[in-house]
A protein has these predicted regions:
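Beta-strand signatures of extracellular beta-sandwich domains
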Residues: 93-95
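Extracytoplasmic beta-sandwich strand-turn segments characteristic of Greek-key/jelly-roll folds
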Residues: 66-74, 98-141, 166
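Extended terminal and domain-junction accessory segments
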Residues: 1-91, 137-143, 147-166
Length: 166
């Protein structure tokens, strides 16, 4: 322990034929992504990530996860804004299954740089309020979870269940 590290060396000595076409630039009219706006939204929801005074208890909207309870019901094809507020003293990476998001704003400020792209997880720091927008595509019906992506927080209850109706 504490003495040196092992490093693996890779020697690549063969080239393999590859018929994959990679563009130097995208063809005219190709759209990588488009920004969703508040005008696209058909519904808004609020989520508060917090912790309890009881040791090791993490909550979303004042509740611990229960597989027997659907916390949110979403219409298939809906575009929704989810507002996530972190009232705890530690950061929480908010993650939802089966949907990609765009950050609308963080504490009221528009996203810049890498925050402008599609996300499946968004970091919400202590005291922050982050609004995200996503479209629940037609293939995404069924029950899914949203949760803090820190395993110990998720296991301690910081998770909810949402259902996308067919």
């Amino acid at each position: 322990p504490g003495e040196g590290i092992d490093i693996m060396r890779f020697d690549v000595d063969t080239t393999v034929a590859d018929d994959v076409l990679l563009y130097d630039q995208l063809p005219p009219g190709a759209e990588i992504w488009s920004r969703l706006t508040t005008e696209d939204a058909t519904n808004e929801r609020s989520f508060v990530m917090s912790w309890s005074h009881a040791p090791g208890v993490f909550l979303i909207n004042g509740k611990q996860y229960s597989e027997d309870r659907v916390d949110e019901t979403v219409e298939k094809g809906a575009t929704e804004i989810w507002e996530i507020t972190n009232t705890s003293p530690v950061p929480h990476p908010f993650h939802a299954h089966a949907i990609q998001w765009q950050v609308l704003d963080r504490n009221g400020a528009e996203p810049t740089g890498v925050e402008r792209g599609w996300k499946d997880t968004v970091l919400v720091n202590p005291g922050e309020n982050v609004r995200i927008i996503g479209r629940f595509e037609p293939v995404n019906f069924g029950k899914y979870v949203y949760h803090c992506h820190i395993l110990e927080h998720e296991d301690a209850g910081m998770m909810g269940l949402f259902e996308v109706l067919p």
